[in-house]
Amino acid sequence: MLMKGTTTVGVKFKNGVIVASDKRATSGTFVASKSAVKTLKITDYAVATISGLVADGQYLVNNVRTIADLYSLDTERPLSVRGIARILAFLLRRYRPYFLLAQLIVGGVDREGAHLFNVDPFGTLTEEDYLATGSGSPVAISVIESGYSPDMDRESALRLVISSMTAALSRDAATGDGIDVVVIDDRGVNFLSREEISDLVREVLR
């Protein structure tokens, strides 16, 4: 069974990055999973979100996580966020003409600051201030574009991310079953609890 369909978003704020993804995985019109994990930790300061085929995305993230761990052991410093994104892009290009059907958002913080990268199935790599991928991305990106500011603080960025995800959940049939939200700043990767996310959703929908 091919599990796919999703909405993932990423937004840079003044001191970090926030990414989010829904939990629904579909196979055609069938809801294959209501608890799919599409936001995965790579290092203590970087994560990736997956849209497309879940298995392909997980395979790519597992590979780059291993490479990042080996790099850290060898050099005694973490692999940069740009380095992580470049490796993912290389892995995707390596499988041509047999594409891995996954698009990834890579978000994190390193010595150069906060970064947000888009890596598409062809291995194209771009750095952005905000992103949305997956079947619900047209809805999500319209919400983000209407409210984004480069100097947003953490709380404003969180509300914007939650607003974009709730809009996608309400309009896209392949998006649903809750969301995962991760904040990455100079303190590292922080997966928000269910209670924190629920409070934010209630605040946005109030």
Swiss-Prot record:
Example GO CC term: the record gives: proteasome core complex, beta-subunit complex
Some GO term, biological process aspect, for this entry: which one? proteasome-mediated ubiquitin-dependent protein catabolic process
Q: Which gene encodes it?
A: psmB1
Q: What does this protein do?
A: Component of the proteasome core, a large protease complex with broad specificity involved in protein degradation.
The UniProt subunit note reads as follows:
The 20S proteasome core is composed of 14 alpha and 14 beta subunits that assemble into four stacked heptameric rings, resulting in a barrel-shaped structure. The two inner rings, each composed of seven catalytic beta subunits, are sandwiched by two outer rings, each composed of seven alpha subunits. The catalytic chamber with the active sites is on the inside of the barrel. Has a gated structure, the ends of the cylinder being occluded by the N-termini of the alpha-subunits. Is capped at one or both ends by the proteasome regulatory ATPase, PAN.
Q: Where is the active site?
A: 6
Protein name as annotated: Proteasome subunit beta 1
Principal place where this protein is found? cytoplasm
HAMAP family xref list? Proteasome_B_A (MF_02113_A)
Catalytic activity field: Cleavage of peptide bonds with very broad specificity
